């Protein structure tokens, strides 16, 4: 919240969703005069985001995690891109800076050891580019489009797999701009919920988890297939997307998806 307030060019309506809220979060938000939504239970990302989005007063909805630090100029990059596009049929995302991996910056793993000074002195030195097929937060969608597709699909509780599912729903609405902005940066501490539940089969990465199974049964293809052949994820951005080329690689991978689909549907009996 602090980073949004001090590092934003524009004024934003901030609407957190509070799960359970026994740690004083509700009281803090009330003191800060920040509007929020609330459930007495852990609603997960999808239900929480859907509830919060209903309170949105502006034309665009930005979904973000609670463990992001927004770097200066993050919203200017979004605004400039929206102005270039000149219509509402898009899905834009920022770029996450991690503490490990390629183009990383070790600025801490939590709020207690966060080195804000190091981040602000070095984030512009990182070599990020605009990329194709983003499925990650922070993402920006026009509110009319968000409402048209029904926001996040809540069957993906607690949330893993819901991002590419949203992308697929947008694809079905003939949206072909899925662009990650290399200069709109947030520092990501990493999911605290995932770390706490790293043995929970419901909370894992996209490949092989419950969310991937739901996606496969819902759409007939895997998340990996969708990101590779449709979204062309992580390639440098060139232009809006078109229908995938149905070459041998595509057809072979599609057959594997259908075999996995049949296994899940009729033998594994996934619920």
Language model features with spans:
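Active-site donor/metal-binding and catalytic loop motifs
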Residues: 97, 157, 179-202
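A short, conserved alpha-helix in the catalytic core of glycosyltransferases
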Residues: 78, 132-150, 155-185
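Short, flexible, basic/aromatic active-site loop/helix in glycosyltransferases
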Residues: 109-132, 136
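Glycine-rich, basic loop-to-helix element that forms the pyrophosphate-binding segment
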Residues: 39-56
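Short aromatic/hydrophobic "clamp" motif used to bind/position activated sugar donors
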Residues: 61
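Conserved donor NDP-sugar-binding/catalytic core segment of glycosyltransferases
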Residues: 72-110
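A conserved acidic beta->alpha catalytic loop
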Residues: 18-27
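Short, acidic, metal-binding catalytic loop of nucleotide-sugar glycosyltransferases
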Residues: 2-11
């Amino acid at each position: 919240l602090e980073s949004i307030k001090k590092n934003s060019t524009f004024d934003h309506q901030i609407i957190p969703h509070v799960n359970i809220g026994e740690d004083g979060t509700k009281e803090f938000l009330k003191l800060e005069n920040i509007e929020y939504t609330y459930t007495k239970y852990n609603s997960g990302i999808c239900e929480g985001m859907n509830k919060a989005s209903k309170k949105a007063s502006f034309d665009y909805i930005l979904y973000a995690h609670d463990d992001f630090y927004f770097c200066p100029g993050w919203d200017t990059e979004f605004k400039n891109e929206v102005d270039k596009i000149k219509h509402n049929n898009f899905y834009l995302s920022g770029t996450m800076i991690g503490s490990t991996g390629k183009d990383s910056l070790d600025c801490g793993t939590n709020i207690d050891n966060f080195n804000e000074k190091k981040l602000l002195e070095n984030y512009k030195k990182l070599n990020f580019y605009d990329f194709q097929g983003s499925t990650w937060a922070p993402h920006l969608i026009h509110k009319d489009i968000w409402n048209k597709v029904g926001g996040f699909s809540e069957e993906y509780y607690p949330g893993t797999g819901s991002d590419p599912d949203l992308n697929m729903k947008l694809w079905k609405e003939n949206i072909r701009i899925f662009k990650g902005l290399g200069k709109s940066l947030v520092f990501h501490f990493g999911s605290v919920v995932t770390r706490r539940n790293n043995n929970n089969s419901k909370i894992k990465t996209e490949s092989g988890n419950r969310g991937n199974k739901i996606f496969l049964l819902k759409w007939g293809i895997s998340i990996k297939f969708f990101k590779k052949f449709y979204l062309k994820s992580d390639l440098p951005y060139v232009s809006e997307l078109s229908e995938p080329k149905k070459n041998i690689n595509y057809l072979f991978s599609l057959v594997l998806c259908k075999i996995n689909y049949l296994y899940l549907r009729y033998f594994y009996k996934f619920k």
